[in-house]
């Protein structure tokens, strides 16, 4: 088994990425987290062999479109805890990527091209400023975990009904007034976290979700004596109110 070529520059107070890094085109893993980086040059596109790229905990305000040239990225891309107000459209070229974290940024939207990331299994966009998701989110047919805590999401697009592999959905601390109907047919969904929204009523179809194991409704306006909740518990679902 080939040894992965890794360059770990975590917390080196770099301020900027040394030019020498971009010449290391054999790298499989590049860790640049927590370095006070404010910009990333187009040279990032030269590292064609990268499988994992960690740019978390910096001060990046944008990411160059050349990121989309890293088509071998298959493990993880960390962009969390930066100052990103938008993501490059070229993200859609990363069809092999399995894990993407863009949490803790001031993102208000996600690019429609995200639907091209067909290999994505876990997507984290917690603590941004999202009000909804793009329709293209429904193209992520391999998605198993979706983490959206701490946004201002009022609704989910109808296309989320196509996320048939979804197991875990975190929607706590958002602005939902009803449970999104697009979840009704997701037969593999096991956990739904709806804490701290604006829910006051629940749809009957929740009791028809065959795999539902845990439903967290704390800090909403839901009446804990609703017959539906008792029914869910009899079906083996843990309900927290």
Task: Label each region the model flagged.
Residues 104-108, 112-191:
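Eukaryotic tandem repeat interaction scaffolds
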């Amino acid at each position: 088994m080939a040894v992965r070529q890794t360059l770990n520059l975590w917390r080196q107070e770099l301020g900027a990425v040394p030019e020498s890094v971009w010449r290391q085109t054999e790298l499989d893993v590049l860790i640049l987290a927590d370095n006070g980086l404010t910009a990333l040059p187009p040279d990032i596109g030269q590292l064609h062999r990268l499988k994992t790229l960690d740019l978390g905990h910096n001060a990046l305000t944008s990411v160059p479109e050349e990121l989309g040239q890293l088509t071998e990225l298959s493990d993880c891309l960390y962009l969390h805890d930066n100052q990103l107000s938008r993501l490059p459209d070229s993200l859609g070229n990363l069809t092999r990527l399995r894990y993407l974290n863009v949490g803790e940024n001031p993102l208000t939207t996600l690019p429609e091209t995200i639907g091209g990331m067909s290999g994505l299994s876990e997507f984290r966009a917690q603590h941004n400023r999202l009000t909804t998701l793009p329709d293209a989110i429904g193209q992520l047919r391999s998605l198993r975990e979706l983490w959206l805590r701490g946004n201002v999401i009022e609704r989910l697009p109808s296309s989320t009904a196509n996320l048939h592999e979804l197991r875990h959905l975190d929607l706590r601390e958002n602005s939902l007034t009803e449970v999104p109907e697009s979840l009704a047919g997701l037969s593999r969904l096991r956990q739904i976290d709806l804490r701290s929204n604006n829910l006051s009523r629940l749809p009957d179809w929740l009791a028809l979700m065959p795999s539902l194991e845990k439903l967290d409704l704390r800090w909403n306006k839901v009446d804990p004596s609703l017959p539906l909740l008792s029914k869910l518990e009899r079906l083996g679902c843990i309900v927290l109110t």
